[in-house]
Amino acid sequence: MRILLTGIPSYLQRTIADVSGTTVIHRPYFDETRTKKDLIAQVRKIANTGNYLIGEGAAESLRGHNVTYLPFWHLANNRDSNEIFEQVNREFDLCVFASANLLRPGYSADLEAEIFAKLTMPVVVMGIGIQRKEGLKDQLPAGTLKFLDVLRKKESFFLTRGYFTAEFLREQGMKFVKPTGCPSLYFSPNDMKRSLTALANPALAEAQKIAFGGYLGSVADTIVDAHALLKPDSVASYVVQDELVAYNLSLTGGDTDIAYDRSSARITGATEYKHSEKWQRKYELLVYFDTNQWRGAMSERDLCFGRRFHGCIIGMQAGTPALMIAVDDRMREMLEFIGFPYIEASTWNRETDKRAYLANFLGKIDTQAVIDRYSACEGNFRSALAQIGL
């Protein structure tokens, strides 16, 4: 099948130099990332580096087909060109749109509505989810309601992040809706199972090689976690995803100052952010633009821990145990669907002896039940793809 893949990209799409019609032109190298300006630009391009896992997972699920990734910006920039959309409709049999928490009050899907209205082929929306449950329909922007209306009227398939999104879309009249979870969950199933097996180990509460993830620049929660779990002479490794553009983690130097070491993925420039004075451990800030480098680094950790879904999934893809702290409905929907062990943020935050609580929690995990649930979800995902013809 000739598949048009668009939406959230994998890290490989960082090499795209130009697009002409349906021909994508790639550079034989990645953009240089060394200065403050370079670093911020690379984060801004993807908005959140965790998104690369979504695009990568979607692409991997289409292996075996004739797949072309066309950047969504190319379709958007040429939405008034009948010639280009005639070419797209002629050359592809199916469109797969890699998505995330598109159903949210702060995002209006006007462009998606306009573009999908121009496609004559069926559309698969893969990985669509919500940000917050409360008042969802009443708060969705007009552009997003139009997007749903367009897809309701054509042959469309929705693979959702979880049950709530699926229920919501069915209420909107969508015919083919399957809760499948994020496609990143099925990128490397054997390693995911290895990670889940390793997690049921109380000794991990004493681990010192931990990759932390959270919302540095906004709240101090991750700093508190590091102090609770790490010994005074240990180094806290914090993985940045979108904090440089969304959560006021600022680089203080000039635009041309060296701020990033690509080999180690370490931010070397001086930073400034809320609560930074509270650190009582040495720490490093890391940011990855290559998912293979990211997985390689996580494979050397004892544990991935924190409030970022994909910041933990990348570790699981490397076979490293990972435990998430659920902070919002978006995370809860995905975690409840896939059945991974997790701790509610409100519960974790009020624990005074976090290390003891963690050891007790890990010791109670039913590994076989967790793996059985994951395997069932993977089978469900493959089955949904097969029903679509993928």
Residue ranges, per PLM feature:
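Active-site anion-handling motifs in enzyme catalytic cores
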Residues: M1-L390
